[in-house]
Amino acid sequence: MDALLVEKVLLGLFVAAVLALVVAKLTGKRLRLPPGPAGAPIVGNWLQVGDDLNHRNLMALARRFGDILLLRMGVRNLVVVSSPDLAKEVLHTQGVEFGSRTRNVVFDIFTGKGQDMVFTVYGDHWRKMRRIMTVPFFTNKVVAQNRAGWEEEARLVVEDVRRDPAAATSGVVIRRRLQLMMYNDMFRIMFDRRFDSVDDPLFNKLKAFNAERSRLSQSFEYNYGDFIPVLRPFLRRYLARCHQLKSQRMKLFEDHFVQERKRVMEQTGEIRCAMDHILEAERKGEINHDNVLYIVENINVAAIETTLWSIEWGIAELVNHPSIQSKVREEMASVLGGAAVTEPDLERLPYLQAVVKETLRLRMAIPLLVPHMNLADGKLAGYDIPAESKILVNAWFLANDPKRWVRPDEFRPERFLEEEKAVEAHGNDFRFVPFGVGRRSCPGIILALPIIGITLGRLVQSFDLLPPPGMDKVDTTEKPGQFSNQILKHATVVCKPIDA
């Protein structure tokens, strides 16, 4: 960066500081703000807490400042909520008031400034997009129509692992094959198509683009330019890469998937998949073509990878807890005999369901949920919440607080058959809201729960899942991001066939 730009940035910071002090004096409005660490002018708490606002760091701050706290991150107000009662207030009781989504410089690029559903503000556009996406993606009818496909994809995973000679000896990184399964599960619903193998060039191009999109948006690297707009020139290359990637992904979605469905619909006149429903909504003038592409963007980001993370965490915990793995296997043998688990079987397998819930509790894929925002000044727990504050619900801490759970740091599925028997993943208890609650909850829960259950069930039926030779456990170190909680190292797992 040249000296002139640095000089301009420093001058901008000085002017901003003076203006902030003048405005504060002139307005004179005293707000009762939530507690939090004292901040410095302009940067606020940014230099104190840093960029890494992950669920564990925010838990530590909550233990210090309480169930609601305020961080001033440059020009952004960030409110962190860490109690079930306040989570209910944000997600349900004041679901309209706090029902919008925050914007940042990177997500504005990838969502066209909120032309999608997941990251748009609460209002008419969100209601329209939610309605258009619900019927083809998120209903019991969709589950009934697609469950056989999910079961088939899980069967093919088992077959491919069996064929790999390394799987039963040194082990394999099973995530790679499961990633193909997840893409096929969702692309069957979305486009009525699938990829034949992990070597498919189009699959690998799509996967690479989505991985880069995830890296760029999940990184904490760009926070400084979002918190302090005058520093945004330092992000020029970062944002240029985001724009370039967005164009590449949208072109790939359009050329290889959306246009194909248009051609098929013109030839047959039939509606066979979710994209056909969405293109019909475009034909009727309910949405524009950019909205169509942003729906594809949302499914690629919000449905595929998040479910894959949960499956990967579930496998790691089963490997590290062989007695729990055996109980799952014994339950399926008792209930199903030798039959492979199917989606309708899941309700007859309470221990398997408990394993899924315990995975979502301890290893929540979206530990802070998707951030909320209030468009107007609001109130929460008696405190003033300035308009356009970013509201983070630390859902992971709610589900792992030792004041509210028995031995929460243990992977113990039995809790959901004993003291927490009434607790479900759909949010009937605000201590456990892995998919959120209310208007902005994740509608993908209706797909994620059966896919996770089928996949873990089929793997445990078919294999004894073990750590690699010479190891007692697989590494479960976390890799937190802006919105995610992934496993740091994709585990190598020995898959020893049960019938061997």
Curated annotation (Swiss-Prot):
Transmembrane segments: 3-23
Membrane topology (UniProt): Single-pass membrane protein
Protein name: Trans-cinnamate 4-monooxygenase
PANTHER family reported for this sequence: TRANS-CINNAMATE 4-MONOOXYGENASE
EC code(s) of this entry: 1.14.14.91
Reactions this protein catalyses: (E)-cinnamate + reduced [NADPH--hemoprotein reductase] + O2 = (E)-4-coumarate + oxidized [NADPH--hemoprotein reductase] + H2O + H(+)
Coarse class of the protein's main subcellular location: membrane
GO molecular function per UniProt: heme binding; iron ion binding; trans-cinnamate 4-monooxygenase activity
Gene that this sequence comes from: C4HL
One example of a Gene Ontology biological process annotation: lignin metabolic process
Organism listed in the record: Oryza sativa subsp. japonica (Rice)
Protein location: Membrane
Cofactor(s) the protein needs: heme
Protein keywords: Heme, Iron, Membrane, Metal-binding, Monooxygenase, Oxidoreductase, Transmembrane, Transmembrane helix
Stimuli inducing this protein: Induced by wounding.
Cellular component terms per the entry's GO annotation: membrane
UniProt tissue specificity: Expressed in roots and leaves.
Residues holding heme: 442
UniProt binding sites for (E)-cinnamate: 213-218, 302
Gene3D superfamilies (UniProt xref): Cytochrome P450
